[in-house]
A protein has these predicted regions:
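C-type cytochrome heme c attachment motif
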Residues: 76-83, 123
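Non-catalytic, surface beta->alpha helical segment in thiol-disulfide oxidoreductase systems
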Residues: 120, 125-157
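Thiol-based oxidoreductase modules, predominantly thioredoxin-like and allied folds used
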Residues: 73, 84-92, 96-111, 118
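Short pre-active-site segment immediately N-terminal to redox-active cysteine/selenocysteine motifs
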Residues: 66-69, 73-77, 120
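Structural micro-motif
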Residues: 68, 110, 116-125
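A short beta-strand-turn-helix
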Residues: 43-68
């Protein structure tokens, strides 16, 4: 009876370890999906390391990324933001090798929104790999996004 109990306990431990390894594997697959053209939701800490550390560089714009990006300041309750969201998701996939698309929920990241003076949403930052960003307010059409991406972010005519 004791051996049967020990065997059962070992089986339970092995099952837990294998489930834990599976969960870690799923996380890394999700991380790869983000790198392959998904829209990435940022918090303040992520923004400071991936986009612009305004606490360290208060007088000069220094982009922290290596690919051009779009940053969408949005809210879940915002109608125009809901129109822009699927367009950005589609563009993140279409331009997955060229740009990164980020989203920042202004209700969750009030300090970050205040740092950029966000007063209306959606507000979009178009950030080239080198140079200063451009800002756009309001819902843009897919054609307007494509124009901004190609001409401003990627420098195509």
């Amino acid at each position: 009876m004791r051996k049967l109990k020990d065997l059962f306990m070992i089986s339970v431990v092995l099952l837990l370890v294998s489930c834990s390894m599976s969960a870690k594997s799923d996380k890394s697959e999700t991380g790869n999906a983000v790198a392959q053209g998904e829209v990435v939701v940022l918090n303040k800490a992520d923004f400071l390391t991936k986009v612009y550390n305004y606490e360290k560089n208060q007088t000069e714009w220094v982009y922290e990324g290596n690919k051009p990006c779009i940053v969408d300041f949005y809210a879940d309750w915002c109608g125009p933001c809901k129109k822009v969201s699927p367009i950005l998701k589609e563009l993140a996939g279409e331009y997955k090798n060229d740009i990164i698309v980020y989203k920042i929920n202004v209700d969750n990241e009030k300090e970050l929104a205040a740092a950029f003076g966000i007063q209306s949403i959606p507000t979009l930052l178009f950030i080239p790999a080198k140079g200063k960003p451009q800002i756009a307010q309001g819902a843009l059409s897919k054609e307007q996004f494509v124009e901004q991406i190609n001409s401003f972010l990627l420098g195509k005519k």
